[in-house]
From Swiss-Prot:
It comes from Dictyostelium discoideum (Social amoeba). Chitin binds at P53, Y54, N82, G83, V84, R85, Y128, M191, D192, Y193, D194, W347. Involved in the degradation of asparagine-linked glycoproteins. May hydrolyze of N-acetyl-beta-D-glucosamine (1-4)N-acetylglucosamine chitobiose core from the reducing end of the bond. It is found in: Lysosome. One of its GO terms (molecular function) is chitin binding. Belongs to the glycosyl hydrolase 18 family. This is Probable di-N-acetylchitobiase 1. Residues 21-369 form the GH18 domain. Its EC number is 3.2.1.-.
């Protein structure tokens, strides 16, 4: 989830008129909060208000709204018909965590928004560095207060929290109270992507996988070591990749190592900031574009992830694309199934367009979480 999207969303939400509109569905029962208890989850994060006709509804349970436009009436009715919750992303300014007046107003505004738009809850997406244990506790208290306020109105409202991929090492300086957050909410969505953070002293940076299964597994295990129940953990996975420029000229389209420019982030030298995020549909179109020279999709057995080299049309230089496909996603979904996690999720479900041949495998990989042994 990207901060610039969240900031835009919160500014828009705060100016939404408080007047409730009439139910747009032919069946007015669909405008009531979904009365569905705890279940296995497939949460899809949406950044586009118009792509919902392309969704696969077979196992989708929750859609996280990360755009500023109003929710389409058709989407609302379609989601509720399929038993899918709609929840708003919720960004909260860390500097206001000790301001009780601000907190009360914020919670009331969010509750009013959800009630007036016939939706089903909030997804907290606070990704700021927090290293002070007192501030971390204040964040937990905010989530708990929000959850209590929502549940006092309707027990079926859903409150979830997005967290970094590993709870043990203060990833991105997010030293949150993860156990407390898991108890204060319905579940945590572990963002198992953007994992490329290589050491402080690396002299040579190499392109690499966005979401290696070994790191996904170790991160999840570390959450459980804190005492967090597996039923409170949802594995969030990427439907996108990173396009990295390769420095130098001694490359072929079959070269494995791609040296990339250093890109400092929170003290790390080698991060995915050296690349450009590319959605899955565009990646597939690039592979099928005869004007783009590429070496074909390769498989890195160590990171269990696909990649390919190509010649950039604009610069004429070699690039390397690391991404996820149905094969790599299935490996991680199997980890979620084996660990008996609460569910899986995707950032974001608007990465696939109307080409069924491209999208069916990606949806199928996530839907495999629900298969019966």
């Amino acid at each position: 989830m990207k901060i610039f999207i969240i900031i835009s969303l919160i500014l828009t939400i705060l100016i939404i008129q408080s007047k409730s509109k009439e139910c747009p569905c032919s069946n007015v029962e669909l405008c009531k909060p979904l009365e569905i208890g705890p279940r296995k989850e497939f949460i899809g994060f949406s950044v586009n208000s118009t792509f919902y006709p392309y969704y696969n509804w077979d196992h989708l349970t929750t859609i996280g709204i990360f755009y500023s436009e109003d929710i389409e009436d058709e989407l609302l009715c379609m989601a509720k018909t399929n038993g899918v919750r709609l929840v708003y992303s919720a960004f909260y300014p860390v500097e206001q965590l000790s301001n009780e007046t601000y907190i009360d107003q914020w919670i009331n505004e969010k509750l009013e928004l959800v009630q007036n738009t016939f939706t089903d809850g909030l997804n907290f997406d606070v990704e700021y560095p927090i290293t002070d244990p007192i501030v971390a506790q204040q964040y937990t208290q905010l989530v708990a207060a929000t959850n209590n306020a929502f549940k006092s109105v309707n027990l079926y409202y859903q409150i979830s929290v997005d967290v970094a991929w590993d709870a043990s090492n203060c990833i991105d300086y997010r030293c949150y109270d993860y156990l407390g957050l898991s108890k204060a909410s319905d579940f945590l969505v572990v963002m198992d992507y953007d994992m490329k953070l290589d050491g402080y002293y690396f002299k040579t940076c190499l392109a690499s996988a966005n979401s290696p299964p070994s790191s996904v597994l170790s991160g999840m295990v570390n959450f459980t070591k804190l005492g967090i129940d597996e039923s409170s953990l949802v594995m969030g996975l990427p439907w996108y990749g990173y396009n990295y420029p390769c420095i130098g000229s001694n490359y072929t389209l079959q070269t494995f190592e791609c040296i990339i420019p250093p890109s400092s982030y929170l003290g790390y030298n080698c991060t995915d900031a050296s690349g450009i995020e590319i959605n899955y549909s565009i990646i597939m179109n690039m592979l099928n574009d005869t004007a783009i020279q590429n070496g074909g999709v390769q498989w890195d057995s160590e990171s269990e992830s696909p990649y390919f080299n190509f010649i950039d049309l604009f610069s004429g230089t070699q690039h390397q694309m690391w991404f996820d496909n149905p094969d790599s996603l299935t490996i991680k979904v199997n980890i979620a199934r084996t660990m008996n996690l609460r569910g899986v999720g995707v950032w974001n479900i608007d990465q696939l367009w109307d080409d069924h041949s491209l999208s069916s495998g990606m949806w199928g990989a996530l839907n495999s979480f629900f298969k019966i042994n």
